[in-house]
């Protein structure tokens, strides 16, 4: 009986490790390409994108997962995971890109069950967000 418990625990731990590794390394080959736009800035180019899809849940009042998107600094900083949401210069490593591109299971943004109210970003919009991040997220 003890052997069965040990084997079950080891199997569970191995499965969990595989799941966590997959969450940390999303398949970036599925990302839309970065837009070929130069000089993108947060207030003019990015804020309108996130206001439409993200602000209702991640605004100043009771932001989900303590992640606010209502300012440049907050958008980059991230939330309760204490991991930066944006890695300036590296959109492919930025968690916010993984979430809006639906690369992380159960972390799709906006959540799939809320997309009737809050639309998913289009591939073109994700490309603009990627270009802004790749240009330094200024």
Briefly describe each language-model feature range:
Residues 19-138:
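Aromatic- and Gly/Pro-enriched helix-to-coil junctions and flexible linker segments
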Residues 7-17:
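Bacterial N-terminal signal peptides
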Residues 1-5:
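Positively charged n-region of N-terminal signal peptides that target proteins for export
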């Amino acid at each position: 009986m003890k052997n069965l418990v040990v084997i079950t625990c080891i199997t569970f731990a191995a499965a969990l490790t595989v799941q966590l590794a997959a969450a940390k390394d999303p398949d970036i080959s599925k990302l839309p390409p970065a837009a070929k736009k130069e000089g993108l800035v947060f207030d003019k180019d990015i804020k309108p994108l996130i206001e439409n899809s993200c602000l209702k849940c991640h605004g100043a009042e009771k932001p989900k997962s303590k992640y606010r998107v209502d300012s440049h600094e907050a958008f980059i900083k991230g939330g309760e995971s204490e991991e930066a949401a944006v890695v300036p210069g590296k959109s492919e490593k930025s968690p916010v890109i993984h979430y809006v591109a639906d690369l992380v299971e159960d972390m799709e943004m906006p959540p799939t069950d809320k997309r009737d109210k809050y639309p998913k970003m289009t591939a073109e919009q994700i490309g603009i967000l990627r270009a802004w991040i790749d240009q330094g997220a200024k």
